[in-house]
Amino acid sequence: MNTIDTVVPEMNPALSESIVFAPIRTGEEGEKIPIIPINAALSESIVFSPIPPPPSTTDNTTNTTTTTIETTATDNTNDTEEKQENIENNNNNNNSSISSPNSIDGANKKDSIELEEDKEHSIKRKDGSLGDVVDNEKIIPNSLDSDAPEETSNLNKKSEINIKQVLKNPSFDATNDNHNPQEVDNTDNPDKPTTPRQTTTTTTTTTTTTSTNSTSNKLPNNGDNTVSFDEKFDPNVSHSNLNDDYKASGSSDSPNRVRLNTSQRLKMYKQKSEKRLSHRPKSIKLEHKKNVLGEIIYKGHPSWALMLNIQTGIRNAVGKSMGTEGGVNAKTPQQYHTLRKPSEFKRKEDFYVSPKTQRFESAGTAMTNAHSTGAFKFKDYCPNAFRYLRYLFGIDTADFMVSLCNTLKNGENALRELPTPGKSGSLFFFSHDMKFIIKTIPKDEAKLLRDILPSYLEHIQSNPNSLLPRFFGLYRVKPHSGRQVRFVIMGNLFPTKKKIHERYDLKGSVVGREASVDEKKSDSVTFKDIDFRNRKQKIFLGPGKKQSFIDQIKRDCKLLQSLNIMDYSLLIGIHYPHRENEPPSPSLLRSTLEDSSDFESPSMEQSSAGQQQQQRGSGNYDNSGAGRDSTTGGAAPKENDEIYISAFQQDEGGIKSQGGDTEEHYFLGIIDILMLYSLRKKVEHTYKTLKFGAKQEISSVSPDEYSERFQEFLSTIIE
């Protein structure tokens, strides 16, 4: 049934008695034509206007007073046209079809045809007949997530909405406003009874409003919550919640907002996801290492700038051997580009020469790359000699740089610092893979290392099973506003993933050579000579390896004795396989470093790239030259140059026990070899002799006496 509206004329009261008003009729295209059975001459003086809202009435069933006002597209004023356009734009932007009252004219027929086309379009999308359909996408005609084509031709649709609401909020979105959630369309659920909304018929002397079909006031959105707009507008009630509901629905303030298709929505979602993930810390898979210790040098750490300067200098110094034509390192002297032997130099001193100090500007120079820290100076001592030592020890140049100089901007792969653990006040930096140690040393120790370097290199060449520490480089860094720091790079004595259950620092002396009570309570305690004797157990190497060990100790001690060096010690780490499942201790080697002014280690990982496992004692070495440094383009050592792995580091950097009651895994090496028998040590010897007696075994003795006592003690604890 059609909705009948009545209009009230504004005219001369004197003529009102002669005029009879009749209901208007609906013409084509929804145009309303008033029927006035009076003199046509009077029609020009009549102006039709909408009737005022009737007084509210209360219904016992729904407690709702509704007034249905049909919006029409008339040409009376420009304001009416703008209102109608805003309403139609809202309907089109939300891709929803708002039904008109039932009518016998062609308006409802056109609406029903358009609804049928929408259903057919949705079926085609579900069947995959349209090219822009995404798999498993749910097609909802009235949903904002649907990318169904918009209906742009529905300019003459009738909309049952509250005009006052539209005037209050011109961008009001009919499909997104759920201020009346009680109105639910149960077309998708036929089992659930549908409760028709009670309508109210109000009759006055001049107005008749009828609503007979409740379904015409609902929005057809396929089972979703519908919205009714026949709620009466009360000027005394605030309607600010309409704006709140509208904003909460996620709609734009503009009625002509741009709709996104499926590909655009997926791209936008991907960008938002990447933005969220960029603020999250990256997930780092850390390999469990039981011998990890020290503090990671994070960005902002006091040693952060020092670490970056050290890494920048090492990359430039060690990278010279990897220089290529046209690169920065290609401009350095040719003698640093290739691996060379001492015999290739006419003068022996030229092999141990050090280049000039290089200045690193922040912006970079022709010889250096740009860096993030301030300007600093860097000195590389004896690069030819240390590079040749790295070759003999089987250390690949690329692996060496990756272990030490692979810190990222976010702090990943940074060095680990063990600050000032010993009496010397030195700092220790461990590489992120725990292969190498960077130790700061004083000037006199750096000078001693340069002085003994020729004898040390010759000893390593002739003694592949040497237990002496393995040095890989000596450098000096001087920040622009700071003091210069000298540091040496060595191998870690405990590179294994196995837990070191016990540690012993043995010198062969007795005075002051016992761990304190407080130290013994710590899991990282390093025991000393008296503790080892009280252990009443020996190191079981087997008869053959025992003799090899004693012979090698004699040769090493002979070298140190000739260099006037004393106060060194044998560091022993013991791993018990039957205690494999015990939790790792919080900080390993800390007590060892506290007892030692130097922490050098002869160990290295057997699996280093470019490494050849060759052993002179067993005769199973390979002199094919396959182990030469493949990172250089220049000459390499001849085929008779042999790369050796110590016989006491064949089993993951250590040696397994042979005999004894329990299975044990030993890690052995001599440490603290950069200590001369200087005037200070002589004064210490005199003082302790007077205090404890001449017959007492004290540490500060002459190099000859120290070497003899050291060898004698070790021969008694090895089986």
Swiss-Prot record:
Biased composition (Polar residues): 172-184, 218-228, 248-261
InterPro entries: PInositol-4-P-4/5-kinase_C_sf, PInositol-4-P-4/5-kinase_core, PInositol-4-P-5-kinase_N, PInositol-4/5-P-5/4-kinase
PTM annotation (Phosphothreonine): residues: T262
Gene3D superfamilies: 2-Layer Sandwich (3.30.810.10), Phosphatidylinositol Phosphate Kinase II Beta (3.30.800.10)
UniProt xrefs under SUPFAM superfamilies: SAICAR synthase-like
GO cellular component, one term: plasma membrane
EC numbers on record: 2.7.1.-
Catalytic class of the enzyme: transferase
Protein's UniProt keywords contain Membrane: no
PROSITE patterns: PIPK (PS51455)
UniProt keyword Cell division present: no
MF terms (GO), sorted A to Z: 1-phosphatidylinositol-4-phosphate 5-kinase activity; ATP binding; phosphatidylinositol kinase activity; protein kinase regulator activity
Residue spans of biased composition, Basic and acidic residues class: 107-129
Keywords of the record: ATP-binding, Kinase, Nucleotide-binding, Phosphoprotein, Transferase
Domain PIPK: 316-718
Biased composition (Low complexity): 57-77, 87-104, 199-217, 606-619
Top-rank taxon, per record: Eukaryota
PANTHER family, sorted: PHOSPHATIDYLINOSITOL PHOSPHATE KINASE DDB_G0267588-RELATED, PHOSPHATIDYLINOSITOL-4-PHOSPHATE 5-KINASE
The protein's role, per its UniProt record: May be involved in signaling events that underlie chemotaxis via the chemoattractant-mediated pkgB phosphorylation.
Protein name: Probable phosphatidylinositol phosphate kinase DDB_G0267588
Provenance organism: Dictyostelium discoideum (Social amoeba)
